[in-house]
Amino acid sequence: MASVTSIDVDATQHLRDILKLDRTEDSINGNQRKSNSSFSSDLNGLLVTDQVAAVGTSLSDTNLCSAAVLNSERQVICLSGDDSSSCIKITGKDVEIVASHDSNICSKARGSNKVKIQPVAKYDWEQKYYCGNLIAVSNDYIAYATRGANGSAMVRVLSLTTAERILLKGITGSVTDLAFAHLKSNHLACLDEAGSLFVWQLTMTNGKIQDDIVVHIRRPENTVLSIFRRIIWCPYIPEENEENVVDDTSQTIALLHEDKAEVWDLEIIQTNHNTWPVDVSEIKEGFIIVKGHSGRLSEGALSPDGTVLATASHDGYVKFWQIYIEGQDQPRCLHEWKPHNGRPLSCLLFCDNHKKQDPEVPFWRFLITGADQNRELKVWCTVSWTSLQTIQFSPDPFSSGVLPGLKASLDLSAEFLILTDVQRKVLYVMELNQNQDEGKATFTSISEFLLTHPVLSFGIQDVNHCRLRNTEVLPAEEDNNSINQEEILECESVEAAAGVLIKLFCVHTKALQDVQIWFQPHQNAEPAILGTAQPQQENFALPDIQGINMERMPSMQGSMHGSQSDLCRISTDFLLLPTDSVPKLMTPDAFMSPSASLQQGITSPGSIISTLTTVTPISSTSNSDTVLARPSEEMTLSTMLQLDTSATLSNPSRDGNPLSNSRNPAVVIPGMSETIVSIPAAQMPSSNHPLELQDLDPLVVPQASPTRERSPDVISSASTAMPQDIPEIASETLQRSYISSVPSGLSVEGCESSHHSDSMSSAASALHLLSPHNLSSLDHGHRPIIIGSSVVENERISAPSLLESTIQEDNVDIGLPQPWPAAPDITKETRNNLVDSSRNGQDRGDSSFHRHNYHLLQQHDSQDASAEQSDHDDEVASLASISGSFGGKGQHLLIKDWKSKLSPRSSPKLRRKSKKDEMELAKSPRVSDHLVNLELQEELLCMLRSQQKELSDLRQNQLELMKKLTDHMDAVQSSIMGHVERVIDTQQEQEQRRVERILSDGHERNGQLQEYLSQQLSHSLSGSLSNRVDKIIREEMKKTVSQCISKTLDPVAAQLTSSVAAKVTAVEGVLKENVTKMVKSKNVTDAIGRVAADSLQTVIHSAYREAFQSIVLPAFERSCQSMFQQVNNSFKQGTQDYMQQLEAHLRSIKMNEQETRDPVVTQLQQMVDSLQTVTDQLASNITSNVRSEVQHQLHIAVGNMQDSILSQVQRIIKEEVSHAMKEQQAAVTSSIMQAMRSAAGTPIPSSHMDFHSQQTHILQLMQQGQINQAFQQALTASDLNLILYVCETVDPQQVFGQHPCPLTQPVLLSLIQQLSFDFGSRTEIKLNYLEEAVMNLDHSDPVTRDHMGTVLNQVRQKLYQFLQAEPQNALQKPARRLLIMLQGLVPPTLS
């Protein structure tokens, strides 16, 4: 293959052209990303740099976005495993990362709190370094390798939506690699140890996973099994504005084997082959083989266009190959180099953004390579082929013998590199920053997350950017999914800064787990300059509350004009015959519309459809995977909407001084097209608690009549111009009497990008604008009301609203918890009462655990319909006057009118004043003062009643809120106490275990010490006393013991001799007898034999072994040697003699054969000549005989065919003539009938065709297969003869034997009604069609249900008359069967 010398300049330039490396970047000027928030300077470990200048550098002052100049050349990062710290900043070009001691497998440190784990499947995987992937992840499925009970390899596929699972089998050896084509794909590829390729297409059918094999390429049976095989899909690049993903986009796949790489075009393979599996030897096209490495291939990558393959090998080389599958060109090496000085490579990652590809940014601009199981990573620039940064991973000093074995993977956006260590229970997340303009790419930070087990393989599902608060607005390119608020509270961060949520599936040594990590990375931009606003973020809208998206549907109108007049033409008694006995046959159009009873229900003035406005809430389905599971001990208000009233500004400076916005953002209220109210951002400290927003299920908004649907009580506008921009959120606890709504169309302008105020505070401010005293300002003069193009200062307004009072109290004392405020649209007297009650509730809430500020957005429904209608009219009038006036002095009056008429629950003084002004303007000199006084008294009485009712409602509301708040506090207190008790119990158990461990260690040390002392004592005593005791005992034995024994034993010996002699004689006889019996006993002999055998076995065995080894074996060897020598000599001599005899015999045989061959050859030649002559004669004879026989047979066959053809033609002509005669007879009969009708003076409609033309047209329709149209035309003509003609022409089985029935329900009903008119003639065909038509009626069809009873009742009556009139008819049996069928179908109520 190609070598280093074969690479020329043209090949390298071709690679640069493919990768778009020489393209200018002039158009890319404004794409640099900037962040608003300052970056935390907390470190997760110890940073050691070689240069002193880098030590004093402030982390928050570093511009990480450019990454052009690194602060130091050498940096050592010692990870500590501290979960409470932030991620560590990387500043050096050559960085060494030392693993923490807590990440060791033997360490008992707990996992990180930022990692949320959910078990998916339990299985024991072997802990080793896997070259391929054990798991593959897509948006809908996960697949992982496993083994069955018999040890065979399998792939388990699990659906993420339905939890349905299946097994994929047929794998040889074990699974070496798994991969989906891309995240949105349902094509799963698998490679086994034999190199066989499996590609399945996964689909969901009726809740079950269906696996269809798309490609199965099988290797030969003698293929060497290898675990070093990889799958590389061609990357999927989403198109701009692409919604539906076509799964056939990734049809190119590369397979890496030990010595070669293969690139396959699956589309060509599927086109050429239909059955699977297919042997690789049978495939002739659609693939290409790449060879050129001297070591084992470890990694690879395909370019997005599929024309370049990059391979990394254990020989240390990375090579780029130009490939063309469809052509005949061999792969050509474009470039090669050693990134790690020849060390074996284990990683090859190109830093391309596959989530959102910029067409101006070239592919393969930066490259990450890894060596020695990714213990060393390097970032490369593919333009200059220079190393930009080097990262080295080292073990901790306490376990230096266990080297890291890292698995690395980039997310789709190429912003984060995720690494797991097979030897340690840790996961690293490294943030990658790319600068296309400067040609720099570096790692800017690293985060360490401790796990419970080492990760052997993992698959990244998604990496989302999310805010710390749900109400924060994300940029358009970021995902708007956010994690649960309970999980955000655990992050202990008070800033509304951006965070990252990583979702991945990990294969541990014990289980497969769903892992979710939320952390706050470094901000890749400098702090924004005070007073400078970002243009792209000045205007932002309040987002919809997550999980709730309610849309108003347009009201349904119940008027029906066009169809009523047509329906009225249909008589309800259409089954009754007229006096002239002419049948009134119903056409199929009569059965197309609902019955009269249904029409009356629709057109009734009291109908629900015509009087009610249907409002349908639609809940947006959020991804359940993005919301983390909440801990069971944490409790939130499930029935209240919790909103934070503080507008928090992030502090980019290090000293934490609060900042105030220099501009006043404007809030646009939906429904007031020309009204813009400017609200300044409140200056708040940065220590406010984060927003806690409870996820609520969408509630159905109660339907209301048109007189109530535009009530000004609802905060959102009643206009239907943009209904999708006005979502409503209803609180469950206040559903009976209140409706809470949050307008989503609020737009805030002028907000600085570095200081985002709370969007929910803006919503509360917009709510405040709708209160009666909504124009009061905190800073007196900086909040003008803009109507049209004029500005009116708000110094006219005197009374502050409840929301402003709450904000002022928050500014005075931010440390005290704030109570629940009441509804904003209340009177001045009620507001004063509520302020007092709020202060009392604030004093009672000092000991509360919850320190958040809540606002309850609520509106009251008035029970007085007339007052509500009048309030609505006033509001419409005031809004019309405001929108119609634009300048001059009249604006002041308009604003006052708007203040007084905006809400029906405004202050009595303002209402009284506005009504008085209107009456003064409206009255004329002819109206008396008495009438004015009466009207004023009535108005005052109405106001007093409404105010009293509102006061009672508000008091009841306040009591309910206080009760709920007390219950919530009790629940929170119980939760905290339970949590504290569990923590104390856990700590006590840990201390108890530690004390027990110390005591056990002490006992163990004491036992070891005692054992050591006893051993030393015994050793010293045995050494010192053994010699002395031995000598003393020997001397004493010689001197005293022998003499004493001799003196004592002499008399005893004499006595024993005499007694023994006497007893021996007595016993001798007994012994002889007993011994004789014993010897003759079989058991004794067996026992003696066994004992003798046991005792002699070892001795005899050893003796025989020694004798055999010393005597037999040498003698046997010598004898065998001499014997084999003699045999060898004899064999040689015999072989030589045999060869001589064989040669002589062969020579004699050869001579004899040569003598006999010549005459045989001569005879064979003669026989061949004679055979040729005979063959020629036989050929001529056979040809003549065959020709004559064929002619004879053809003559006979032609004669038979003539006879049969004549008979067939005659029969066909006879049938056609008879059929034509029948048609002619029918035409003549119809002509006569028409002539008779015309003679009677009945006018013939001009639109009707004559009977013959109708028959012809119907016959054409039936010949074309349009059976329904043919029957419909015949039924529409209202002619029974035409209907019977169609029924006789078409067989009933041909019509009703199909499924579904080709005749529609109206046609069936009309056919039944017309055929049942008269059973006197052609009864059989009528009964056959009626039986089949009745059986094919669809009872679920509304038209059939409306008309079936009447039609079938008529058929039953006609059948009954027929049976009574003709009891002896042969068709009585089918008629009775049809009658019984009709009695079962027609209910008694319809008969």
Curated annotation (Swiss-Prot):
GO terms for cellular component: nucleus; P-body. GO terms for biological process: deadenylation-independent decapping of nuclear-transcribed mRNA. Residues 703-724, 897-924 are annotated as: Disordered. Residues 935-968 form a coiled coil. The keyword Membrane does not apply. WD repeats lie at residues 170-210, 226-274, 292-331, 340-390. Keywords: Coiled coil, Cytoplasm, Nucleus, Repeat, WD repeat. Residues 915-924 have a biased composition (Basic and acidic residues). It comes from the Eukaryota. Its main location: cytoplasm. It is found in: Cytoplasm, P-body; Nucleus. In the process of mRNA degradation, seems to play a role in mRNA decapping. Belongs to the WD repeat EDC4 family. This is Enhancer of mRNA-decapping protein 4. It comes from Xenopus laevis.
